[in-house]
């Protein structure tokens, strides 16, 4: 069955995206790193996006940086992004099992983005509106 942490991921994602029927099948694993959460994502889209277009779209998001060099096998690792406010995405590729699916890897320092920095950024958005 699913763990409590996995169900929290399902429920919170659906709530944040206001998508109660969103299909999510997470697996969480505790690994020995001091900071940073990492997630391997497999996402099916309504229309085919393609890896290059996905990289372009990811690069437009404030607070998300693309670090993806498949030829050199360079992509975000927790030790490299620790202490940074941004989240990082890499390993962007078209999924071989579905024509409109992508797989990618995301890393972020939860002590920055998941906590203090996020609170400040939300407050700034509220003050600007």
Show where each model-derived region lies:
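Active-site-lining helix/loop region of Rossmann-like oxidoreductase modules
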Residues: 1-60
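Structural motif
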Residues: 21-24, 65, 102-103
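Generic structural "secondary-structure junction" signal
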Residues: 4, 31-36, 66-68, 91-94, ...
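Generic, low-specificity signal for short hydrophobic/alpha-helical stretches with a mild N-terminal bias
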Residues: 23, 36, 71-74, 101
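C-terminal helical cap and adjacent loop that interface with cofactors, partners, or active-site loops
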Residues: 44-46, 59, 77-129
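Sparse, context-dependent recognition of short Cys/His-centered cofactor- or disulfide-binding micro-motifs
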Residues: 2, 26-28, 72-77, 89
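Terminal hydrophobic/aromatic helix or amphipathic segment near a protein terminus
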Residues: 48-82
